[in-house]
């Protein structure tokens, strides 16, 4: 089984979000499971010199996209049992950033077409093209388009993964031929048409041989108009080929027993180092040195769907539990200003770190007793799994991947790893925070059992890779 994983970003080469973590971890896990895996992504100028020095130039071609005739170079390197291919074009990928350009549609149409045109230049012809989000949504469509005149690619199957359905790749109707170089029939027959515009994600969902999302609960929720962003009828139509596969995390990189960012190390069997991490963070962030005060943390983008309006409503109630609170992240100004204001109201008890620093995030995970993630929507989420790995008990809303990865430890549950609430309501969130801090104060041994149970959960990519391999083999 040969799989070419098509992505617009991949860690450690370039990253803006969770897609990069998935693209950097899943293909090596597939390789370990026996799949011949390769990855192809754009050669952005942000990819560092340390990686460029390892690359080999393979060849160049020209890609025809509508009336455009563009240079396309191909580079590669080997890493973790995977060949990583890089598509070079300075016009499109020398921008200083990955996304947010006026011509993103053209840039990623070029990349998607280049993937198809470069297939003969790879070490092998793939059995499966695995595409991700709107940036690569044209790949299954271009493949179908060229298959009528290119018999060698007719046996290739496609998988399309929806990481976040909010971003669909919507463009004007005239972009079909002018921008994407496709026959108008792709729009006229409804494949790419939605509400009078082109919708790339819709087209890929219809044309791919299988569609996956990043958790079973999120896959089920996409039938609901509240979550599907207008695509619920498409989800209903393709339900027979849709799968939910929970993401994993890099359990080697995220390991409190060896993480170089931590002032002390610890394991589920020997938790002494976690107290050192907590004390160290309290000192660094100006919090009172109180080892027995529960420390609640958030490491998040400060945007609305992360549930920050609930936190705003409940903040004083949270602090009334007698806890300490740390938030790390950047985003919407209203939330940044809110947390700065609250930090001033609660000196020594609330720290607002309005920035993002990887090492600091790891220190926060290691120091925290509880990790708050009250998302309005969360396709999968990685933070709750990282938190459990570092012994921070998650408090999450039961939605998307949060519902699939956190087991309730409310009364009567013997295998719980965290606290869940269902209604999107500040009172419901505050109630479970009270339960969690109450257990911490009233039954430390019981709390530590929950903490250690979460640390031993298997969040490796092995299970995810096995699920994807099963999907590939049954296309």
What is the predicted role of each segment?
Residues 1-475:
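Catalytic cores of nucleotide-sugar-dependent glycosyltransferases that transfer UDP/GDP/TDP-activated
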């Amino acid at each position: 089984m040969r799989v070419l994983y098509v992505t617009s970003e991949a860690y450690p080469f370039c990253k803006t979000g969770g897609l990069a973590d998935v693209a950097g971890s899943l293909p090596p896990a597939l390789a370990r499971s026996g799949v011949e895996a390769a990855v192809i992504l754009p050669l952005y100028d942000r990819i560092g010199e340390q990686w460029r020095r390892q690359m080999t130039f393979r060849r160049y071609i020209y890609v025809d996209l509508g009336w455009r005739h563009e240079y396309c170079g191909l580079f590669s390197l080997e890493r973790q049992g995977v060949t990583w291919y890089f598509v070079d074009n300075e016009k499109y990928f020398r921008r200083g950033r990955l996304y947010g350009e006026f011509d993103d549609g053209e840039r990623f149409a070029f990349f998607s077409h280049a993937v198809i045109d470069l297939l003969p230049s790879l070490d092998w012809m793939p059995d499966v093209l695995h595409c991700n989000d709107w940036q690569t949504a044209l790949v299954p469509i271009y493949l179908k388009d060229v298959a009528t005149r290119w018999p060698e690619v007719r046996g290739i199957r496609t998988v399309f993964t929806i990481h976040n359905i909010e971003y669909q790749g919507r463009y004007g109707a005239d972009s079909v031929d002018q921008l994407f170089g496709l026959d108008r029939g792709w729009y006229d027959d409804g494949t790419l048409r939605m509400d009078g515009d082109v919708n790339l994600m819709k087209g890929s969902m219809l044309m791919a041989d299988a569609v996956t999302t990043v958790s079973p609960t999120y896959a089920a929720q996409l039938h609901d108009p509240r979550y599907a962003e207008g695509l619920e009828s498409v989800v209903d139509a393709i339900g027979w080929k849709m799968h939910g596969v929970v993401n994993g995390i890099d359990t080697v990189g995220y390991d409190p027993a060896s993480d170089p960012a931590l002032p002390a190390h610890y394991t589920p069997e020997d938790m002494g180092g976690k107290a050192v991490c907590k004390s160290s963070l309290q000192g660094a962030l100006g919090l009172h040195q109180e080892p027995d005060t529960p420390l609640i943390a958030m490491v998040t983008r400060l945007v609305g769907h992360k549930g920050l309006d609930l936190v705003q409503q409940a903040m004083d109630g949270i602090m009334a539990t007698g806890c300490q609170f740390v938030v790390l992240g950047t985003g919407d100004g209203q939330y940044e200003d809110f947390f700065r204001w609250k930090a001033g109201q609660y000196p020594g008890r609330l720290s607002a770190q309005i920035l993002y620093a990887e090492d600091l995030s790891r220190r926060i995970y290691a120091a925290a007793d509880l990790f708050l993630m009250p998302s309005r929507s969360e396709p999968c989420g990685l933070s709750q799994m990282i938190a459990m790995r570092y012994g921070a008990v998650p408090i999450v809303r039961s939605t998307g991947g949060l519902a699939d990865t956190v087991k309730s430890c409310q009364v009567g549950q013997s295998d719980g790893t965290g606290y869940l609430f269902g209604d999107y309501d500040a009172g419901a969130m505050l109630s479970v925070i009270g339960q969690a801090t109450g257990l911490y104060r009233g039954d430390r041994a019981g709390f530590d059992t929950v903490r250690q149970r979460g640390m031993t959960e298997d969040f490796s990519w092995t299970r995810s890779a096995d699920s994807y391999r099963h999907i590939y083999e049954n296309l």
